[in-house]
Swiss-Prot record:
Record EC number: 2.1.2.3, 3.5.4.10
UniProt keyword Magnesium present: no
Domain MGS-like intervals: 1-148
Gene this chain is encoded by: purH
Keyword Membrane appears in the UniProt entry: no
The protein, known as: Bifunctional purine biosynthesis protein PurH
InterPro entries per UniProt: AICAR_Tfase_dup_dom_sf, Cytidine_deaminase-like, MGS-like_dom, MGS-like_dom_sf, PurH-like
GO biological process: 'de novo' IMP biosynthetic process
């Protein structure tokens, strides 16, 4: 079953030359004949390796500025030829068998990511010969090894040493899978790039936005298998995007604790994305993908203490996110006070990790400090389809708000309004958030009726003995009726921030005026479903 195949001849043609010299040296030292092209051949020759240019082997020169190098029967016949079946025809046409192909492709993704990249630049970085060789070798994996990742170089040499210069069929099959994944991702990038240019190329309207191509090709890499999904009867895995530049749960490093669950990852993402909204030291506590306590403070310890007070019951078994390094004092406060599933922060001090290590079930993640939020796409799976939209990075500043009531907000009310508006963006709709002195005091999430979300926020504050009088309230969408304002006023809210836009805005504003409430319109909605 091993079906070993000796590696006697290898063709090397790589764009990313990291590790290629050392790999070629190892192959040559084991008696492997080296074929190569262009820059790869020159590099290997400069390092003193015995290498045959493909053009010398085929008797056909590279041409058209390198566009045609390996597209030749003596190359592809050597790769595709079936050992034991095509030997006679290969011998007739002087085609030598090629046992290993080492190829990675022109850097198309890096090229189009560069500012000012032209269509001509992009086109010249579409690899033709490379993918053709990759697919040929992968198709004939029964006889040929295809290597597309430099991370496989060492393992290949080790297996050759363990198998007298041969590779097993299992290894060749695994390498073929990687090869097909590699070319599929490469072609997807090209298709997405060209698809994004359709509107401009054809002079179409803004509605035909290039961010949403006619065909959507997505490429994700499996990071880990999960024990189960959202529920124990569901199987699950976690896939990540390549080359993500922004700090995220997908790129975070787990420095402590047992494996993350499906729900851990979803909740940690919600907590981290919320805490990114704040410049001041901040803490976000999340339960079931909803913030249950958020605060900013003079330090992350202060912020945590205030966030916890919002809803200590819900904080139990929650996810905690910070936008500053986790320090020992804060870690001790958390461990002493509550059970926590995950703590995520840009970094964690050694002293903090010694403290959290006392609780083996606590997972600690570090994600690095983030900069500007990166625009991107959000996806929602529906049965038989996929909804795609821009990532919600919208936010408003004080200068963009419209005061629509007779009373102006005080400075503190305005600060609290902007604070709870940031939080409301991450609460499931219908979302209502009460805040006072830069901390949440009540959160009403996910109710079908907005007025009930407002009532729940008031009940939450009352249950924890938090004073609502003088607080601000944020609503993720407009109030369709005045009842939400009446409920807020009854609880003690004195300032409301909301998008506006209801056909009954006049009634809602009148209700605010009746109660002496200052009301701010953002002209921006933050539904979250």
């Amino acid at each position: 079953m091993q079906q070993r195949r000796p590696v006697r001849r290898a063709l090397l043609s790589v764009s990313d030359k990291a590790g290629i010299v050392e790999f070629a040296q190892a192959l040559s030292a084991r008696g492997v004949e080296l074929l190569s092209t262009g820059g790869t051949a020159r590099l290997l020759a400069e390092k003193g390796l015995p290498v045959t240019e493909v053009s010398d082997y085929t008797g056909f020169p590279e041409m058209m500025d390198g566009r045609v190098k390996t597209l030749h029967p003596k190359v592809h016949g050597g790769i595709l030829g079936r050992r034991g079946q095509d030997d006679a025809i290969m011998e007739e046409h002087l085609i030598q068998p090629i046992d290993m192909v080492v190829v990675n492709l022109y850097p198309f993704a890096q090229t189009v990511a560069r500012e000012g990249c032209s269509l001509e630049d992009a086109v010249e970085n579409i690899d033709i010969g490379g993918p053709t060789m990759v697919r040929s070798a992968a198709k004939n994996h029964k006889d040929v090894a295809i290597v597309v990742k430099s991370s496989d170089y060492d393992a290949i040499i080790k297996e050759m040493d363990d198998n007298e210069g041969s590779l097993t069929l299992a290894t060749r099959f695994d390498l073929a899978i990687k090869a097909f994944e590699h070319t599929a991702a490469y072609d997807s990038m090209i298709a997405n790039y060209f698809g994004s240019m359709v509107p401009a190329y054809h002079g179409e309207s803004k509605e035909a936005d290039g961010r949403f191509p006619r065909t959507l090709n997505l490429n994700f890499i499996k990071k880990q298998d999960m024990r189960y999904g959202e529920n124990s009867h569901q199987q699950a895995a976690f896939y990540i995007e390549e080359n993500v530049k922004e700090a995220s749960v997908a790129t975070a490093t787990q420095v402590q604790g047992k494996a993350l669950s499906y729900n851990n990852i979803a909740d940690t993402d919600a907590a981290l994305e919320c805490v990114k909204e704040f410049a001041e030291p901040a803490c976000v506590i999340v339960k079931h993908a909803n913030p249950c306590g958020v605060a900013i403070g003079n330090s992350i310890l202060d912020a945590y203490d205030r966030a916890y007070k919002t809803d200590p019951t819900s904080a139990f078994g929650g996810i905690i996110a910070f936008n500053r390094e986790l320090d020992a004092e804060t870690a001790q406060a958390i461990i002493s006070r509550q059970f926590v599933e995950v703590i995520i922060a840009p970094s964690a001090s050694e002293e903090a990790l010694k403290i959290t290590a006392a609780k083996q079930n606590v997972r600690v993640l570090t994600c690095g400090q983030w900069g500007e939020r990166v625009p991107g796409l959000d996806f929602k799976r529906v049965n038989g389809g996929l909804l795609v939209q821009d990532r919600d990075l919208g936010m408003v500043g004080a200068e963009e708000l419209r005061v629509v009531t007779q009373r102006q907000p005080t400075e503190q009310e305005l600060r609290d309004a902007l604070f709870c508006w940031k939080v409301a963006k991450f609460v499931k709709s219908n979302a209502i958030v009460y805040a006072k002195n830069n901390m949440t005091i009540g959160i009403g999430a996910g109710q079908m009726s907005r007025v009930y979300s407002a009532k729940i926020a008031g009940i939450k504050a009352a249950d924890e003995g938090l004073e609502v009088k003088g607080s601000s309230m944020a609503s993720d969408a407009f109030f369709p009726f005045r009842d939400g304002i009446d409920a807020a006023a009854a609880a003690g809210v004195t300032c409301v921030i909301q998008p506006g836009g209801s056909i009954r805005d006049d009634e809602v504003i009148a209700a605010a005026d009746e109660h002496g409430i200052a009301m701010l319109f953002t002209d921006m909605r933050h539904f979250r479903h």
